[in-house]
Amino acid sequence: MRQLRTLVNEAINQGYMHADAYPFRKYKIKQEKGRHEFLTPDELKKLETVEVEEESMRHVLDAFLFCCYTGLRYSDFCQLSPANFIKVNGKRWLYFKSVKTGVEIRLPLHLLFESRALGILDRYPDIGSFAALPCNSEVNKQLRKLAELCGIKKRITYHVSRHTCATLLVHQGVAITTVQKLLGHTSVKTTQIYSEVLSSTIVRDLKNVQRKRKKVKMFPDKGLRTSDFIDNR
């Protein structure tokens, strides 16, 4: 069934089938438990800085990075048009309806990952040329070459960009329910499957606990106070 869904997605991406006719919108394929691959901040940096001379490979890399910073699926990226980009109070937002779920998603591009998606978008003369990717299998082949070029020993597919986005948002401390809305998940349980705890996140959280404990010890004779556990912001 997964293979059939892949073929249907490809037919939509190539224009042989209308997105409104997507047959799997209400059909859920059983999710197998397993580790979802994602890129660490260091691996993402390698892809950001790698020198790529081939124009088609550069295009694939930019599209992949754009989705690392927005969480778009391949099918949603390929459907983008100028109408999806709206200005709200002078800031660019991305509005679109997910091909897979039909959920409407609104992304404040200026607030996500220091506007990096906008920086990539502005390199291209129009969104039509940017969104015109080769078929998914060809894109994945290019991504494997890029991973090898960067010394990344992971099996990279286009969907890794979406999982990377979710993982890094959680790593930055964004609430899981907010990540759910940004990704367009109908259930927070789906978002929790996508989130991973990075080692650096564990270290950061434990250091925060240590700092709070030190604040408490500064008042040994006064007992514990509620304010000792609240950050002044």
Residue ranges and their predicted role:
Residues 98-102, 183, 187-208:
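Catalytic-site neighborhood detector that most strongly recognizes the C-terminal catalytic loop/helix
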Residues 1-23, 75:
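N-terminal DNA-binding recognition helix of tyrosine site-specific recombinases/integrases
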Residues 60, 134-137, 153-173:
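Short basic/aromatic active-site micro-motif
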Residues 25-26, 31, 37, 43, ...:
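Conserved tyrosine-mediated DNA breakage-rejoining catalytic core shared by Y-recombinases
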Residues 76-78, 155-157, 166, 173-187, ...:
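Active-site-proximal segment of tyrosine recombinases
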Residues 209-233:
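C-terminal secondary-structure termini that scaffold catalytic or DNA-interacting sites
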Residues 110-153:
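Active-site/catalytic core of tyrosine-dependent DNA strand-transfer enzymes
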Residues 31-58:
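Long, amphipathic, Lys/Arg-enriched alpha-helical "connector/arm" segment
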